[in-house]
Design a protein with these regions (language model features):
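Mid-sequence, gly/pro-rich, charge-dense loop/helix-turn segments that line enzyme active sites
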Residues: 1-69
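Hydrophobic transmembrane alpha-helix bundles
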Residues: 4-15, 77-90, 114-120, 132
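His/Asp/Glu-rich mid-to-C-terminal helical/loop segments that flank catalytic regions of hydrolases
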Residues: 102-132
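A structural motif corresponding to the C-terminal end of an alpha-helix
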Residues: 34-42, 81-90, 124-128
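Conserved active-site and cofactor/substrate-binding residues in soluble primary-metabolism enzymes
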Residues: 22, 26, 60, 76-80, ...
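A C-terminal functional module that forms or caps the active site or interfaces directly
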Residues: 54-107
């Protein structure tokens, strides 16, 4: 999103007073704790996720976005969840399974990654619901 010509920050949604939509702190802490318990074989990282209107497959573009917006990852859906939750005063959390770094270093094919991500996500979601 680039509405800088209208006085908004780059990335800011016009007519929105917020530039980013922080996740609920309690949900964030719970997800980090639970993920380490039910999925000890994966790494858990916390930070801003940058959302945009394009699939990023170029390392230079990814690095520029992360540098400019202070993000940890780049994707296409999270901001819509954050915006809807923010506008409706609903606590939210976005959890992402990162398939690759947009630099050719992916260590498994997408079908294999997809199955692992589904398994990890189900374990995380079930345990989080149990603990809420």
């Amino acid at each position: 999103m680039d509405a800088t010509g209208f006085g908004y920050k780059k990335g800011q949604i016009p007519q929105m007073d917020e530039f980013s939509f922080p996740a609920d702190e309690n949900l964030r802490k719970l997800a980090a704790k639970v993920c380490q318990e039910v999925n000890p074989e994966i790494s858990v990282f916390e930070g801003r996720i940058c959302s945009g209107d394009q699939f990023i497959s170029d390392k230079g573009v990814k690095d520029a976005i992360i540098s400019e917006f202070g993000g940890f990852a780049v994707e296409m859906e999270g901001a819509a969840i954050g915006q809807a939750a923010y506008l409706n005063h609903i606590p939210f959390l976005v959890v992402r399974a990162i398939s690759d770094k947009a630099d050719g270093s992916a260590n498994m094919d997408y079908a294999e990654f997809e199955m692992a991500a589904i398994e990890h996500s189900v374990k995380l979601t079930v345990r989080m619901i149990q603990e809420l």
